[in-house]
């Protein structure tokens, strides 16, 4: 996936905030990269009826780039005080702060609404799947393409 204007670290920051808003446990960039890949490309992965950024054959190939974008995004979000790195739970990772949740609550565009719905659908479909299980889903679709 070539990084385009729509796939900047800033856009990844907004998507990461939305994901963290819905999660009640700390997560890392690998998990968010997998969830991001599935959410943006729902139709390609059989989760929903739409691919938010359009349909293409190489959706499964986005995992590494989306994970890298999430890694950059989480660093910036932590520096801005919108996330914290939580080591108090059994699973360490990033959580959203109250300030980060406030930013999410201000996202009111049509795309944001579509993204919220897609993220919820993805979390419902993923259930309690681990990062490894999500990556396996993504790569199995790539192999089948």
For every predicted segment, state its role:
Residues 11-26:
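Positively charged, polyanion-binding regions of nucleic-acid-associated proteins
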Residues 23-30, 44:
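Short capping segments at the starts of secondary-structure elements
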Residues 38-43, 52-67:
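Short helix-coil junctions and helix-kink-helix linkers
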Residues 70-81:
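Basic amphipathic alpha-helical segments that dock to polyanions
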Residues 109-145:
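Exposed, interaction-prone assembly regions rather than primary DNA-binding/catalytic cores
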Residues 28-40:
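Short, hydrophobic, well-ordered secondary-structure elements
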Residues 1-6:
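Intrinsically disordered, low-complexity serine/threonine- and proline-rich regulatory segments
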Residues 85-109:
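Accessory beta->alpha helical hairpin/"wing" motif in late/C-terminal subdomains of nucleic-acid enzymes
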């Amino acid at each position: 996936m070539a990084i385009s204007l729509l796939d900047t670290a800033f856009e990844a920051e907004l998507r990461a905030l939305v994901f963290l808003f819905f999660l009640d446990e700390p997560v890392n960039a690998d998990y968010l990269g997998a969830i991001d890949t599935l959410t943006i490309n729902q139709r390609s992965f059989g989760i929903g009826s739409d691919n938010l950024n359009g349909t293409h054959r190489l959706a499964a190939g986005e995992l590494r780039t989306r994970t890298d974008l999430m890694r950059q995004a989480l660093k910036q979000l932590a520096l801005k005080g919108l996330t914290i790195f939580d080591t108090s739970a059994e699973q360490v990772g990033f959580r959203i702060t109250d300030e980060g949740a406030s930013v999410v609550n201000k996202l009111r565009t049509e795309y944001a609404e579509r993204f919220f719905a897609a993220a919820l659908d993805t979390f419902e479909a993923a259930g309690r799947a681990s990062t490894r299980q999500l990556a396996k889903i993504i790569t199995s679709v790539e192999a089948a393409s």
